[in-house]
């Protein structure tokens, strides 16, 4: 599926018109299209509905999600809730994209009150993994100045050489004055721009060049009445007639006659009987004036209106306002040029006109090109929460009175991410909640370990009888809440376990290895971090468990990590990381990675696995082409397997801090049932996502 993000280069470029035309062009190509306007930008005094979504619904019959109100967006941005905002937008986008081949996403328009629009558009395009089409309108500028302005905007999204930045559509283009007609003038403009602009190459192209058409901007006479809150003396055809030109008449009739042409709105004081009569005579002679607008609060003489009856019955609209000529003209100048949501005729004409000036063959070819979607960080977080909510699993938290854990459990319970079980004394949990201002939602389970501990003694002895465990020893070990929670998991009373906010990694994993054991086909437990980089999610393993894995261990970690990536919608291209690429180096460490690569390929010949690869060769396309030109993984790796814990843990923390990215994990792999360890510095958000990951693992491991 393709997602096209339509981004304006400035104010007044006609963004909605371009969206309408693109949708029509895509429909002509036989594609199932969707439309999404993430954020509503209503003009002052505009009470809605949001214009773009409503026009798309009326012209294309699409059910579009309701955009977020601008006030809500500004509040979330002001509160530093950009991630939450993007997740909410992705939730709406999923509705628009359901069962579609291509989705048009319309970005924000920069205005005096929304100077942050460009930054928001950047984050929206990245989060939706969208291909960007810029929309610009030439102003009074040279071709060089126009090109520079477009390139500056393209740089916001990665530059014109970024494969996701497709090109530009120029709207409202006025051709050369000496051209035979407007179409020829615009064609000549497009040719000169393409020939002389270094910006417009094959990888950044001119996708469309839309000529300026006065008639497409013509408002209905009724729209003028609404704008001015005018009194309607005679409605006539004011729903159908369009204002092509406004003429302020203060001169004598002989000097006015030549101005009375089709589509003209005549503005004159209400006591200018001569102008009123002249306009009426013109109308009765077949000139379809847009209407008469009488100003200065002078009501027309009834006798004059009686003389004009033929014109009025013929459909001539007559409006009246209290303001004088100057103020009326000023108010008319403030007319919003956008298409009203109920003007279906104008919307259809604009849609067809724009669609006819889009490079249809290129658009069809682009949509027919398969494209691997990258999972952006907000999309990953959204997906994790959605899948956890759908799983509905019961997750035990043995550190039940730890403040961060209590808050995370409350969030997960309230959002339906998991059915959380806090293992702690109820009065301690209540005290923490009161001190932290946490509202404990209904249904949040709190189990006092002292009241249930005894019933796990016998089952634990049975599980560990081969290791010489007796009842007194079991009772002593069950004093540890992590051991008690692990027994609950072993007996299938819960679906997963999350611990580590105050316990060490060993304290979390050891009971799991003793009581849960490894999953069939696995000999060890490892871990991965999901690294939420700005434009994609990568998987790092192992960064938390195995200090110095052997070649066979490393191969197993690679296979486990690839499976984890695929389980969360990330295509698995596995890079076995070393200080050397290919055959360029030798030594014990690089030989271990080389052997691990061979073993992993033997175990899973269906996976893309390559190594040894240096990190830059694995991650950066240009370096990968130079250092490992024949590698199926180099430059596009999604799963990074580090040779030891020292390298893995150092790298994950360095990337996390230097790239200022969120990491989710560690998520443990290889256990028969999901147990996950937290960093002791984990934030509440980290715990929430770890609980969600655990719920998804439990769902994946559940018997069919």
Curated annotation (Swiss-Prot):
The keyword Nucleus does not apply. Activity is increased under anaerobic growth conditions. Induction: The ackA-pta operon is induced under oxygen-limiting conditions by the oxygen regulator Anr and DNA-binding integration host factor. Its main location: cytoplasm. Disruption phenotype: Decreased survival under anaerobic conditions. The keyword Endoplasmic reticulum does not apply. GO terms for cellular component: cytoplasm. GO terms for biological process: acetyl-CoA biosynthetic process. InterPro entries: DRTGG, P-Actrans_bac, P-loop_NTPase, P_AcTrfase, P_AcTrfase_dom1, P_AcTrfase_dom2, Phos_Acetyltrans/Butyryltrans, PTA_PTB. Pathway: Metabolic intermediate biosynthesis; acetyl-CoA biosynthesis; acetyl-CoA from acetate: step 2/2. It holds the Pfam family DRTGG. Residues 379-704 are annotated as: Phosphate acetyltransferase. It catalyses: acetyl-CoA + phosphate = acetyl phosphate + CoA. It is found in: Cytoplasm. Its EC number is 2.3.1.8. One of its GO terms (molecular function) is phosphate acetyltransferase activity. It is an enzyme of class 2 (transferase). Keywords: Acyltransferase, Cytoplasm, Transferase. SUPFAM superfamilies: HprK N-terminal domain-like, Isocitrate/Isopropylmalate dehydrogenase-like, P-loop containing nucleoside triphosphate hydrolases. PANTHER family: PHOSPHATE ACETYLTRANSFERASE. In the N-terminal section; belongs to the CobB/CobQ family. In the C-terminal section; belongs to the phosphate acetyltransferase and butyryltransferase family. The N-terminal region seems to be important for proper quaternary structure. The C-terminal region contains the substrate-binding site. Homohexamer. Involved in acetate metabolism. In combination with LdhA and AckA, allows fermentation of pyruvate, enhancing long-term survival under anaerobic conditions. This is Phosphate acetyltransferase. It comes from Pseudomonas aeruginosa (strain ATCC 15692 / DSM 22644 / CIP 104116 / JCM 14847 / LMG 12228 / 1C / PRS 101 / PAO1).
């Amino acid at each position: 599926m393709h997602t096209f993000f339509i981004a304006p280069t400035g104010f007044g470029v006609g963004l909605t018109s371009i969206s309408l035309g693109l949708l029509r062009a895509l429909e002509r190509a036989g594609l199932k299209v969707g439309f999404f306007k993430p954020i509503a930008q209503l003009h002052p005094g505009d009470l809605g509905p949001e214009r773009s979504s409503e026009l798309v619904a009326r012209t294309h019959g699409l059910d579009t999600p309701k955009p977020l109100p601008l006030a809500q967006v500004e509040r979330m941005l002001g509160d530093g809730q950009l991630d939450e905002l993007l997740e909410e937008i992705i939730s709406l986008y999923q509705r628009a994209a359901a069962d579609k081949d291509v989705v048009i996403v319309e970005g924000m328009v920069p205005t005096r009150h929304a100077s942050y629009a460009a930054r928001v558009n950047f984050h929206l395009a990245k989060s939706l993994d969208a291909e960007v089409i810029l929309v610009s309108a030439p102003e009074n500028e040279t071709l060089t100045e126009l090109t520079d302005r477009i390139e500056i905007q393209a740089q916001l999204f990665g530059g014109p050489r970024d494969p996701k930045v497709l090109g530009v559509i120029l709207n409202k283009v006025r051709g050369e004055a000496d051209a035979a007609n407007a179409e020829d003038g615009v064609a000549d403009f497009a040719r000169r721009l393409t020939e002389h602009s270094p910006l417009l190459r094959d990888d950044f192209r001119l996708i469309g060049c839309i000529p300026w058409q006065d008639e497409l901007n013509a408002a209905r006479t009724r729209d003028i009445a609404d704008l001015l809150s005018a009194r309607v003396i005679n409605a006539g055809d004011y729903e159908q007639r369009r204002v092509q030109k406004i003429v302020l008449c203060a001169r004598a009739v002989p000097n006015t006659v030549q101005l009375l042409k089709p589509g003209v709105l005549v503005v004159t004081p209400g006591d200018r009987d001569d102008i009123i009569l002249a306009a009426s005579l013109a109308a009765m002679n077949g000139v379809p004036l847009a209407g008469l607008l009488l100003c200065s609060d002078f009501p027309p003489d009834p006798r004059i209106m009686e003389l004009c009856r033929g014109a009025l019955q013929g459909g001539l609209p007559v409006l009246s306002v209290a303001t004088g000529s100057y103020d009326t003209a000023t108010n008319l100048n403030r007319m919003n040029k956008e298409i009203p949501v109920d003007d279906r005729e104008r919307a259809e004409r604009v849609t067809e006109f724009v669609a006819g000036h889009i490079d249809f063959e290129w658009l069809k070819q682009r949509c027919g090109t398969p494209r691997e979607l990258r999972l952006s960080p907000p999309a990953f977080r959204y997906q994790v929460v959605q899948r956890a909510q759908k799983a509905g699993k019961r997750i035990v938290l043995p550190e039940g009175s730890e403040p961060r854990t209590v808050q995370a459990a409350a969030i997960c319970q309230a959002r339906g991410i998991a059915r959380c079980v806090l293992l702690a004394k109820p009065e301690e949990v209540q005290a923490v909640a009161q001190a932290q201002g946490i509202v404990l939602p209904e249904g949040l389970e709190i189990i006092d370990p002292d009241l249930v501990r005894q019933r796990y003694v016998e089952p634990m002895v049975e599980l560990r009888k081969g290791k010489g465990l007796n009842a007194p020893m079991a009772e002593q070990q069950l004093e540890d809440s992590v051991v008690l929670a692990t027994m609950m998991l072993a007996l299938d009373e819960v679906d997963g376990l999350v611990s580590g906010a105050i316990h060490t990694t060993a304290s979390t994993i050891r009971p799991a290895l003793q009581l849960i054991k490894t999953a069939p086909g696995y000999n060890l437990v490892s871990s991965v971090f999901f690294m939420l980089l700005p434009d994609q999610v990568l998987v790092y393993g192992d960064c938390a468990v195995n200090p110095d894995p052997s070649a066979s261990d490393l191969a197993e970690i690679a296979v486990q990590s690839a499976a984890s990536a695929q389980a969360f919608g990330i295509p698995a291209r596995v890079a076995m990381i070393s200080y050397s690429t290919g055959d360029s180096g030798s030594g014990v460490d690089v030989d271990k990675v080389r052997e691990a690569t061979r073993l992993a390929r033997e175990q899973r010949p269906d996976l893309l696995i390559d190594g040894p690869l240096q990190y830059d060769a694995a991650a950066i396309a240009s370096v990968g082409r130079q250092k490992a030109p024949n590698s199926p993984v180099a430059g596009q790796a999604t799963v990074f397997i580090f040779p030891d814990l020292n390298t893995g843990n150092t790298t994950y923390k360095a990337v996390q801090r230097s790239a200022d990215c969120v990491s989710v994990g560690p998520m443990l792999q290889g256990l028969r049932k999901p147990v996950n360890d937290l960093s002791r510095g984990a934030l509440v958000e980290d715990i929430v996502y770890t609980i969600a990951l655990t719920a998804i693992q439990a769902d994946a491991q559940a018997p069919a």
